[in-house]
From Swiss-Prot:
It comes from the Eukaryota. It holds the Pfam family SAM_1. CDD domains: SAM_Ph1_2_3. Residues 1-28, 165-269 are annotated as: Disordered. Gene3D superfamilies: 3.30.60.160, Transcription Factor, Ets-1 (1.10.150.50). It is found in: Nucleus. GO terms for biological process: negative regulation of DNA-templated transcription. A zinc finger (FCS-type) spans 114-148. It comes from Xenopus laevis (African clawed frog). This is Polyhomeotic-like protein 2. InterPro entries: PcG_chromatin_remod_factors, SAM, SAM/pointed_sf, Znf_FCS, Znf_FCS_sf. Residues 1-23, 216-233 have a biased composition (Polar residues). Zn(2+) binds at residues 123, 126, 142, 146.
Length: 344
């Protein structure tokens, strides 16, 4: 009895606990497929009722795998080509260098415009064709030496570039006229004596000094000639006026030549040199350069370099500045004189 009584209350407690646990648990919701909507940045996004099919993802995976395989194959082929190309380059080095030299030497050769080749430029001064990265600043010249030579040629506008002969025909006429006007007094002395009589006597070189009696006679003759001129222009000349005119003509005949010491040493040196500059020897060139103003020190350099007349006519500004270490000012003056010799 005791066991029955003792065991009987146990199920009652268990049932009480079960009822209590059932009351305490919240009701579970049934999971059903629902269509959800999202509102993101002004867009209404609605989810699908069914998931995406699985076969589509497999196709995407297959495409990605095939692209990876093709990429690996291309890399392998490129590595094989890279190994073969150096061997071919070693075998054909001589042929490629010869062809490149022919392209650079032949004028007007078309430049190679390959897809992988960098662009090439041509120097405006020396005509050298080279890659663009080797050209400096303005991309016009291949080196600083070419740029400096171009600037020197532009400042003087002579020497480095040969202008058209048709453009030089008109200025030569003016140059010849200037040379005629620059004739030295020694050349005028050797001219016709009739022209010398017409020329007025310079006060620097007067004729022989007359005696006091001759001065009185000449004064009286001048007074008589003035009176005769004022009286009438149609009257014949008096013997006094005729004698005065004769004395003046004699004075003009007795005019002494101009003093050679007061002449320009440049003109004197050029008069003693041969007329053709190409026939000058080293000493003639030395005398010519020494006679120029401010070029006495440079003349020794011309003698040391053994420059004759033909070499003198071939000189340029860059030769004078670079080879002979002459400053810009004397070099430009000297080149101007050389250009005058060329034109003459």
């Amino acid at each position: 009895m005791t066991s029955g009584n003792g065991s009987s209350p146990v199920p009652t407690a268990a049932t009480g606990n079960r009822t209590q646990n059932g009351e305490n648990k919240p009701p579970q919701a049934v999971v059903k497929p629902q269509i959800l909507t999202h509102f993101i940045e002004g867009f209404v996004i609605q989810e699908g009722a069914q998931p995406f099919p699985s076969h589509r993802s497999r196709a995407v995976l297959e495409v990605g795998h095939s692209s990876l395989l093709t990429g690996a194959q291309e890399k392998y082929q490129q590595s094989l080509l890279a190994e073969k190309v150096p061997q071919q380059d070693n075998n054909t080095t001589t042929t490629t260098t010869d062809s490149e030299m022919e392209e650079t030497l032949v004028p007007g050769f078309p430049e190679s415009k390959g897809d992988g080749d960098p662009p090439k430029l041509k120097c405006e001064l020396c005509g050298r064709v080279d890659f663009e990265y080797k050209f400096k600043r303005s991309k016009r010249f291949c080196s600083m030496a070419c740029a400096k030579r171009y600037n020197v040629g532009c400042t003087k506008r002579v020497g480095l570039f040969h202008p058209d002969r048709s453009k030089l025909q008109k200025p030569t006429v003016a140059k010849h006229a200037r040379r005629r006007s620059r004739k030295t007094p020694l050349q005028t002395v050797g001219a016709d004596p009739k022209k010398q009589q017409a020329a007025p006597v310079t006060p620097m070189n007067p004729g022989p000094i007359p005696s006091p009696s001759a001065l009185k006679l000449s004064n009286s003759q001048e007074d008589s000639s003035r009176c005769s001129d004022n009286s009438s222009y149609e009257e014949p000349l008096s013997p006094m006026s005729a004698s005065s005119s004769l004395s003046r003509a004699r004075q003009e005949h007795n005019v002494e030549p101009p003093n050679l010491h007061s002449r320009d040493p440049i003109a004197m040196s050029q008069d003693f040199l041969p007329s053709d500059p190409t026939k000058w020897n080293v000493e003639d060139v030395y005398d010519f350069v020494r006679s120029l103003p401010g070029c006495q020190e440079i003349s020794e350099e011309f003698r040391a370099q053994e420059i004759d007349g033909q070499a003198l006519l071939l000189l340029k500004e860059d030769h004078l500045m670079s080879a002979m270490n002459i400053k810009l000012g004397p070099a430009l003056k000297l080149y101007a004189r050389i250009s005058m010799l060329k034109d003459s």
